[in-house]
């Protein structure tokens, strides 16, 4: 199965495409769509949409795994990311891709086995699982690859699409 993972944003959209078969990962391609801060916001959204659409057309994924939006303290940032996420979801929907959303905790758990792992641990485990010589840069790209790995590890267990289980005392 070919999976496109995306770490949404409006300045940088990390993306990573992974093939997964027989419990083995093979990185296909990865990178980032970057927009210029000096450009009007609607133009940046167009660049995000066009960039993601091009990645989908070129790499032909079967599914999209994307980070679920969570509340941030800076409302301006969260609104901008939500709008960028909207054009990303539009590109995926137009391509007929099923869309799966994951929280940061689900990604940490799926990639490292620990839901409270730090970013560096997730990135290093992503590098190891994909047999890459170095952690991909920018960080958004590594995060997108981790998103694709999360789909692969949770595919088949539909409950993981909807819930985050916490481990701890009851």
Segment roles from a protein language model:
Residues 1-170:
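Phosphate- and other anionic-substrate recognition elements at nucleic-acid/protein interfaces
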């Amino acid at each position: 199965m070919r999976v496109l993972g995306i770490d949404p944003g409006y300045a940088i959209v990390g993306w990573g495409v992974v093939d997964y078969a027989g419990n083995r990962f093979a990185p296909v391609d990865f990178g980032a769509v970057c927009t210029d801060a000096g450009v009007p916001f609607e133009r940046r959204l167009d660049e995000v949409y066009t960039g993601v659409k091009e990645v989908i057309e070129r790499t032909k994924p079967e599914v999209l795994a994307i980070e679920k939006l969570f509340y941030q303290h800076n409302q301006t940032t969260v609104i901008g990311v939500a709008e960028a996420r909207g054009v990303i979801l539009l590109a995926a929907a137009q391509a007929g891709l099923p869309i799966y959303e994951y929280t940061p905790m689900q990604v940490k758990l799926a990639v490292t086995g620990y839901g409270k792992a730090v970013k560096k641990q997730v990135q290093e485990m992503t590098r190891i699982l994909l047999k890459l010589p170095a952690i991909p840069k920018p960080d958004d790209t590594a995060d997108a690859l981790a998103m694709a790995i999360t789909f692969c590890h949770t595919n088949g267990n539909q409950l993981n699409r909807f819930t985050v289980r916490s481990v701890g005392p009851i």
